[in-house]
């Protein structure tokens, strides 16, 4: 049977394939307590952060620039990795491979879970509702307190302004407003 106003059959759904996407951060923002017991959960996804220390780790640099959070929040592992890649790419083009040391200071221990509930026609036959509502793991996050250091970048005096700019760019990838503190040795 053809619907006049839709120009498609009633029983037939559209043939488009809908891709899975990342859930919005407001679903996980207000968590009150940490959930880190990975032995109870099967299949916790691996962290996206590939390297926590980048650059020359043993050199003695005169400037230390630190990015710290202004507010308490949850920072997802892919946001931390995105901030690290942004800062690393910017400072590496200016200071070279051995002109800096970048360190990510937080680790995403907190396991994020999502109880998917089907919506639309016939969802009551498919969905379990709030029965067995523990949820599937969708990722990990770092629980950040206000004033906590997130990323530290050490470099020489000549690249101090570039280090500050690199951390400013990476702060846009994080879900909280950030402070940038410069310390001279």
Question: Where do the PLM segments sit?
Answer:
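Ribosome-associated RNA-binding proteins
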Residues: 2-185
């Amino acid at each position: 049977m053809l619907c006049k106003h839709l120009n498609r059959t009633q029983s037939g759904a559209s043939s488009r394939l809908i891709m899975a996407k990342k859930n919005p951060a407001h679903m996980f923002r207000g968590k009150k307590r940490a959930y880190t017991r990975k032995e109870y959960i099967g299949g916790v996804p691996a962290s996206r952060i590939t390297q926590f220390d980048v650059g020359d780790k043993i050199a003695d640099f005169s400037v230390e620039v630190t990015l710290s959070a202004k507010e308490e929040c949850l920072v997802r592992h892919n946001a931390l990795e995105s901030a690290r890649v942004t800062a690393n790419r910017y400072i590496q083009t200016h200071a070279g491979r051995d002109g800096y040391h970048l360190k990510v200071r937080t680790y995403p221990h907190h396991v994020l879970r999502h109880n998917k509930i089907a919506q639309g026609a016939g969802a009551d036959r498919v969905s379990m509702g709030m029965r067995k509502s523990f949820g599937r793991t969708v990722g990990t996050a770092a629980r950040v307190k206000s004033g906590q250091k997130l990323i530290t970048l050490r470099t020489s005096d000549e690249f101090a302004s570039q280090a500050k700019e690199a951390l400013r760019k990476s702060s846009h990838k994080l879900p909280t407003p950030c402070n940038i503190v410069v310390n001279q040795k």
